[in-house]
């Protein structure tokens, strides 16, 4: 895990341009402005979603760790991805749930930027890991004879570590730069999480270069990895069409189908939210989009893999002890 140094308080211009700056040690996450009964309903709904997400991804990671037959690079990558999903959803949802029942809905200055850092870093690590998983699929289908010699346990470990390290380094500089910027009151972020878009709206001084830097990094992560995945699966599709056996084509398609579904779900939401932030999106829609990729996507991922993959379904039945449960 990469160390992150943030100033604990921010500077806020409290009145006129010539006035002094006041230290601020917290933000207010406005969230959804609705009646108390609706807040309780949303709390119950998102608590259930969070519990199901943790349970589903935890079950996938656990069965892949327990079943030695699935200790292959493809399934170990999936286990790491499920483990990442647990931490990804936990970087924002617990605080969000607390705020549903809180009157003030505050978050400390350092806590806000740490949430932003971990949310984006874990998301970046997931994007990188999905790309590595696509590369693994390419090797397995397009280079089956060379696959055991290329995708060794040593290379697998290197790729996983690289995804984690690069993910946590990618947004380190932007988060430090944003944390040092003075902002104008009130210290209210009109969002459900500490997102850079609403945070930039509070800045006293326009910082187009920093904003461009952040959006460029986001676009590089999203489009760079997405194009690599598209390229990998173009070659995979070409290899599949050249297979003489329909059984082989069906097996290859079933192996890739789950990963493609997860990639589509993940990148579609990311592109909508971060490629053109603030363009054509109302504040309410931005909150809904954030909830979708922060909670709904991690919930569906274990369902997609468990329903599509026979080996994982068999492993789940074995661990749960009953073939009638799955």
From Swiss-Prot:
Disulfide bonds join 112-194. It holds the Pfam family 7tm_4. Residues 1-44, 94-112, 180-216, 281-287 are extracellular. This is Olfactory receptor 11H1. Residues 66-72, 134-158, 238-259, 309-326 are cytoplasmic. It is a multi-pass membrane protein. Glycans are attached at residues 13, 18, 106. The lineage of its organism: Eukaryota, Metazoa, Chordata, Craniata, Vertebrata. PROSITE patterns: G_PROTEIN_RECEP_F1_2. Gene3D superfamilies: Rhodopsin 7-helix transmembrane proteins. Keywords: Cell membrane, Disulfide bond, G-protein coupled receptor, Glycoprotein, Membrane, Olfaction, Receptor, Sensory transduction, Transducer, Transmembrane, Transmembrane helix. Odorant receptor. Belongs to the G-protein coupled receptor 1 family. The keyword Transmembrane applies. The chain crosses the membrane at residues 45-65, 73-93, 113-133, 159-179, 217-237, 260-280, 288-308. GO terms for molecular function: G protein-coupled receptor activity; olfactory receptor activity. InterPro entries: GPCR_Rhodpsn (IPR000276), GPCR_Rhodpsn_7TM (IPR017452), Olfact_rcpt (IPR000725), Olfactory_GPCR1 (IPR050939). CDD domains: 7tmA_OR11G-like. Its main location: membrane. It is found in: Cell membrane. One of its GO terms (cellular component) is plasma membrane. The keyword Plastid does not apply.
